[in-house]
């Protein structure tokens, strides 16, 4: 059992981000910091700090005197992020091919975990390992900092994938 105040902003941020990415908190849903604090057994301060960080990531909309909401999925923004992702990942792949990098050992575990998640119909584990797979590609290409910059934007695609698969029954 967690003790009040034992979770800091970083842990609360990770928990709330996951709940938004994996649709435990749905787009458009109202968020009450006091209710989240109670559920997470923390004070309201780390919740408020986490919500401000999530606002910067595009996952939360905060309207003073009106409320805080999980951001709706902006399809225009999503289209732009997908475009950027195609361009950047294309360059990463060209770099890796040019290096003739032997990535099999570094990437095989993520592929095996994705295959297992697919067999078990575990979309969350599939998405997490796909994310780790792409992070490993960026690192292998020498672009770890680029991944750090663009990764928060790629998370928005995760929400769309989760919503799509949930609505299609897949």
Predicted segments, located by residue:
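Short, intrinsically disordered, charge-balanced linker/junction segments flanking boundaries
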Residues: 165-170
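Short linear motifs at protein or domain termini
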Residues: 1-98, 135, 139, 145
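Conserved amphipathic alpha-helical segments that form helical-bundle/coiled-coil interaction surfaces
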Residues: 101-163
């Amino acid at each position: 059992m967690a003790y009040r105040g034992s979770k800091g902003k970083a842990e609360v941020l990770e928990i709330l981000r996951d709940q938004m990415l994996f649709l435990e908190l749905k787009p458009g849903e109202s968020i009450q910091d006091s209710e989240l604090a109670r559920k997470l057994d923390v004070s309201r301060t780390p919740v408020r700090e986490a919500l401000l960080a999530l606002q910067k990531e595009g996952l939360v909309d905060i309207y003073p005197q009106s409320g805080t909401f999980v951001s709706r999925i902006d399809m225009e923004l999503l289209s732009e992020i997908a475009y950027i992702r195609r361009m950047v990942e294309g360059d990463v792949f060209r770099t890796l091919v040019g290096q003739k990098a032997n990535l099999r050992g570094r990437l095989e575990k993520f592929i095996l975990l994705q295959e297992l998640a697919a067999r078990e119909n575990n979309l969350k584990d599939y998405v997490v390992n796909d994310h780790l797979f792409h992070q490993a590609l960026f690192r292998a290409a020498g672009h770890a900092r680029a991944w750090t910059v663009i990764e928060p934007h790629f998370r928005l695609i995760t929400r769309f994938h989760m919503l799509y698969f949930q609505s299609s029954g897949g």
